[in-house]
Amino acid sequence: MKQKTLFIVALVGLLLVFIAGTLFYSTQKEDQAAQMAEANRAALVRMHSPTLGRAEAPVVIVEFFDPACETCREFYPLVKQMMAANPDRIRLVLRYTPFHNGSDQVVAMLEAARKQDKFWPALEAILASQPDWVQHHTAQAPLVWKHLDGLGLNLEKMRADMTAPEIARVIAQDLDDARTLNVTKTPEFFVNGKPLPSFGYEQLSTLVEEALSSSQR
């Protein structure tokens, strides 16, 4: 009986040590990620980054995204809902991480549409039609054009603007910043400089709510 009790005590002790170690490792990873983001704050937002929302909003969500990413497509309306529920209090900043093959061409389309002040309508049309132009995890940019009809875009001008060197530089800078911040998948979110502790809508929502609460103190 005594040996059985000792065994149970030892087992419980090992379990507690494991839980404590797991929590410590998780907290340490979160702290390291937050410290990295703080040290590399300049890499989070660039002057060229597309933004939505009031410039002085107390909460800034930075999203590294790929237009060919299915999860990015799913998260976009959810982030818009957060913004609608908190008017003028949240600003969204988009950064390009075209990890899918061919996605850089779709990013170039977005930047070309931006030159005609049609970035957000083009983005929403592109995301809505994503199942049509992403095939086998590869972006088929030529299939995107038909989904841009009706937006009032000069498509011929877009085709010419897509090859502009500054667009290539924007993509290169965003990818470089993604490497600096250790962004390896999309979407990747930072809220007021803090990365998500783990990926998920609930985690993003919690971090946003915390930032909103802090801004009211």
Question: Language-model features: where?
Answer:
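C-terminal cap of thioredoxin/glutaredoxin-like
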Residues: 1-23, 146-217
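Conserved strand-loop elements at the edges of beta-sheets that form or border functional pockets
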Residues: 54, 63, 198
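A short beta-strand-turn-helix
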Residues: 42-59, 84
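Structural alpha/beta surface segment adjacent to cysteine/selenocysteine redox centers
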Residues: 57, 62-68, 73-149, 179-184, ...
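A generic local structural motif
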Residues: 46-50, 78-80, 175-177
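Short secondary-structure boundary/capping elements
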Residues: 43-44, 74, 170
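Short clusters of hydrophobic/aromatic residues that line enzyme substrate/ligand-binding pockets
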Residues: 50-52, 133, 196
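Ser/Thr/Pro/Gly-rich low-complexity linker/stalk segments immediately outside membranes or between
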Residues: 27-42
